[in-house]
């Protein structure tokens, strides 16, 4: 395969994977990213235009009889980078999609597949679900969702890269191995589907993994640490640019 083409595809994949896959689109603009997020939470596009509606949403948070009772708005506001009003809007959309107050993995996969109808996002959504499910109980609560979204949208570069590393580190042992990276890359290629037209060779994911490790495995010990990952990403203009696209999309 042409070396320049591999490098170009690698850059696209790094942008997509380093930000949870939300960024990959034909036109990676703040508007297109916002549209994707609103598609995930359709009711979040509705404005809480009056105090009565705002109070209604707040009452839902405090008095809900759903299976999972979310934390108080004030606590979530302190733990995230969203305002109280933004949390009210996001909760309305979340509860509309997930009346029980939590999202299981199958529902998460169904929702996420809307982002990538041209491919198969099932495996990548599994990895992404595990990144949001921080307490590993098999469900993503509103709190889990908000904390992850807060990092992706408004976190510092360091926070976003830590989140991305955790996504790659499948077994959570503090290292990214070639096997883990290959699993992630295969999932991303499947997810992107027609976006990789013309169709790439079967060994393309493995080639991307080799490129990734040549760039990031500084001491050549066969694994990538969090420090190596962050240092390499901070020197990559494409990845840094993709991080900025997330700012203020809500």
UniProtKB/Swiss-Prot annotation:
Component of heteromultimeric potassium channels. Identified in potassium channel complexes containing KCND1, KCND2, KCND3, KCNIP1, KCNIP2, KCNIP3, KCNIP4, DPP6 and DPP10. Interacts with the C-terminus of PSEN2 and probably PSEN1. Interacts with KCND2 and KCND3. It is a peripheral membrane protein. GO terms for cellular component: cytosol; peroxisome; plasma membrane; voltage-gated potassium channel complex. This is Kv channel-interacting protein 4. Regulatory subunit of Kv4/D (Shal)-type voltage-gated rapidly inactivating A-type potassium channels, such as KCND2/Kv4.2 and KCND3/Kv4.3. Modulates channel expression at the cell membrane, gating characteristics, inactivation kinetics and rate of recovery from inactivation in a calcium-dependent and isoform-specific manner. Ca(2+) 2 binds at residues 169, 171, 173, 175, 180. The keyword Signal does not apply. Residues 237-250 are annotated as: Interaction with KCND2. GO terms for molecular function: calcium ion binding; potassium channel activity; potassium channel regulator activity. One of its GO terms (biological process) is protein localization to plasma membrane. The modification Phosphoserine is found at residues 17, 56. The keyword Calcium applies. Pfam families: EF-hand_7, EF-hand_8. InterPro entries: EF-hand-dom_pair, EF_Hand_1_Ca_BS, EF_hand_dom, Recoverin.
């Amino acid at each position: 395969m042409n070396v320049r083409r591999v490098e170009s595809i690698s850059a696209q994949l790094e942008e997509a994977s380093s930000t949870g896959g939300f960024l990959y689109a034909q036109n990676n603009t703040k508007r297109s990213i916002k549209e994707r997020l609103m598609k995930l939470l359709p009711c979040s596009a509705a404005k809480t235009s009056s105090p009565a509606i705002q109070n209604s949403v707040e009452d839902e948070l405090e008095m809900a009889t759903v299976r999972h009772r979310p934390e108080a708005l004030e606590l979530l506001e302190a733990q995230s980078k969203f305002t109280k009003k933004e949390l009210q809007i996001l909760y309305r959309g979340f509860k509309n999609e997930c009346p029980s107050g939590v999202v299981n993995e199958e529902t998460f996969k169904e929702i996420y597949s809307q982002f990538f109808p041209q491919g198969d996002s099932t495996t990548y959504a599994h990895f992404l679900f595990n990144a949001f499910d921080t307490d590993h109980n098999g469900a993503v609560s509103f709190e889990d969702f908000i904390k992850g979204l807060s990092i992706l949208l408004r976190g510092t570069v360091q926070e976003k890269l830590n989140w991305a590393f955790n996504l790659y580190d499948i077994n959570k042992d503090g290292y990214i191995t070639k096997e883990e990276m290959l699993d992630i890359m295969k999932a991303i290629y499947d997810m992107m589907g027609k976006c990789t037209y013309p169709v790439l060779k079967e060994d393309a994911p493995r080639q991307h993994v080799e490129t990734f490790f040549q760039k990031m495995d500084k001491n050549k010990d066969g694994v990538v640490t969090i420090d190596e990952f962050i240092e390499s990403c901070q020197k990559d203009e494409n990845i840094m640019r993709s991080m900025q696209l997330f700012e203020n999309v809500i």
